[in-house]
């Protein structure tokens, strides 16, 4: 069975997230999703939605076979435990594919890295865009 791992914050679930996960699932037989812990989200504003609620939403998606919270101290721990063939990253995730591949190899994790393209089928395909629009509409 070919396992795929997708990772993300998934704050304010939107069509871009669904696209990312559905495209990730197409790469294998079993999709595992690692949902970022609140304390580990340091590259952008803290999530609005709690990690438990974000996990529950991801677990409810048809394309997701398993969803777990990330480890609070070692982001590679769940990846080692899942042992995926492929790790997907979203089009706007800050990872460099080359750096991630090197980090995985350094830890003896044999997984390919695939960046999923951007979904452009709808206007609100990022949490930031949704938040900005909500603020704009409510402060008129």
UniProtKB/Swiss-Prot annotation:
It catalyses: FMN + ATP + H(+) = FAD + diphosphate. Its cofactor is a divalent metal cation. One of its GO terms (molecular function) is ATP binding. ATP binds at residues 9-10, 14-17, 92, 119. Pfam families: CTP_transf_like. One of its GO terms (biological process) is FAD biosynthetic process. Homodimer. Belongs to the archaeal FAD synthase family. This is FAD synthase. The gene is ribL.
């Amino acid at each position: 069975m070919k396992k795929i791992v997708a990772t993300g914050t998934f704050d304010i679930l939107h069509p871009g997230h669904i696209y990312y996960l559905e495209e990730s699932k197409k790469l294998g037989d079993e999709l595992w999703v690692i949902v970022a812990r609140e304390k580990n989200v340091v590259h952008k504003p803290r999530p609005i939605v709690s990690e438990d609620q974000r996990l529950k939403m991801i677990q409810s998606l048809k394309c997701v076979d398993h969803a777990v919270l990330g480890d609070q101290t070692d982001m590679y721990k769940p990846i080692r435990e899942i042992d995926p063939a492929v790790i997907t990253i979203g089009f706007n995730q800050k990872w460099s594919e080359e750096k991630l591949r090197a980090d995985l190899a350094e830890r003896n994790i044999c997984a390919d890295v695939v960046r999923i393209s951007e979904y452009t089928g709808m206007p609100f395909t990022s949490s930031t865009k949704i938040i900005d629009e909500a603020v704009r509409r409510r402060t008129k």
